[in-house]
């Protein structure tokens, strides 16, 4: 994370005491699983709320209600009714209203996760909606995914490459993915995870604490640049 990004976060938080973390990525990559695992680990330490986006349903919100440790009233589903790009970028009004409602309901909130609907590699968040962004891809999509680029790969503040346990079953060389991610990310961090077993989940939490919450902690060793 650059000093520019840290300065930007500080400026945005002058009038509020919470951070907005956008989580995007293709369908099935592990966005909801990441938020579920994160909230289980950090809910006892931080005040957390979640906004999910689905086109026609509230399936992700319902999953988190059943599986995370957050009470149902801290999880809100937004039905976008159209392209998931629009709801997080060109016209983020529904999500901004959801965030406002959530932080009004819970004035102590410190972290608001905003999960986009499943998308391709071009998803980006409006800077008004997300202070920092995490983009999730998975090994099962193939080792060529990092080198395909797209804003999600190249511009997100943290890239999560999930489902590393599937690599031998889908013929993926993780070293190739690492090489290509290094090249495409140009110094920005990424991390390999197996969220089913919580492998390197602590690294994602460490990144959030250091670069989103701006805590004075060491950079996680599992981050790759």
Curated annotation (Swiss-Prot):
One of the protein's GO biological processes: urea catabolic process
InterPro entries in the cross-refs: CobW/HypB/UreG_nucleotide-bd, P-loop_NTPase, UreG
A GO molecular-function descriptor: nickel cation binding
Keyword annotations: Chaperone, Cytoplasm, GTP-binding, Nickel insertion, Nucleotide-binding
UniProt signal peptide: none
A GO CC term attached to the entry: cytoplasm
Compartment(s): Cytoplasm
Binding site for GTP: 25-32
Primary site of residence: cytoplasm
Subunit field text: Homodimer. UreD, UreF and UreG form a complex that acts as a GTP-hydrolysis-dependent molecular chaperone, activating the urease apoprotein by helping to assemble the nickel containing metallocenter of UreC. The UreE protein probably delivers the nickel.
PANTHER family (UniProt xref): UREASE ACCESSORY PROTEIN G
Role noted for this protein: Facilitates the functional incorporation of the urease nickel metallocenter. This process requires GTP hydrolysis, probably effectuated by UreG.
Protein family per UniProt: Belongs to the SIMIBI class G3E GTPase family. UreG subfamily.
Listed name of the protein: Urease accessory protein UreG
């Amino acid at each position: 994370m650059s000093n520019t990004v840290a300065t930007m976060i500080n400026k945005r938080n002058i009038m509020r005491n919470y951070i907005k973390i956008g989580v995007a990525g293709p369908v099935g990559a592990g966005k909801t699983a990441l938020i579920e695992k994160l909230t289980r680990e950090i809910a006892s330490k931080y005040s957390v709320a979640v906004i999910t986006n689905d086109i026609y349903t509230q399936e992700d919100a319902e999953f988190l209600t059943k599986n995370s440790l957050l009470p149902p009233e801290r999880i809100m589903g937004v039905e976008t009714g159209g392209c998931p790009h629009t709801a997080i970028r060109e016209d983020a009004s529904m999500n901004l209203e959801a965030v406002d409602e959530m932080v009004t309901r819970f004035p102590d909130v410190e972290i608001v996760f905003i999960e986009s609907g499943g998308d391709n590699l071009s998803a980006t968040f409006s800077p008004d909606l997300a202070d920092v962004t995490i983009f999730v891809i998975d090994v099962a999509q193939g080792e060529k995914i990092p080198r395909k680029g797209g804003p999600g790969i190249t511009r997100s503040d943290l890239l999560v490459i999930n489902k590393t346990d599937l690599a031998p079953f889908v013929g993926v060389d993780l070293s190739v993915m690492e090489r290509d991610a290094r090249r495409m990310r140009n110094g920005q961090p990424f991390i390999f995870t197996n969220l089913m077993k919580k492998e390197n989940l602590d690294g994602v939490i460490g990144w959030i604490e250091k670069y989103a919450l701006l805590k004075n902690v060491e950079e996680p060793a599992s981050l790759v640049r």
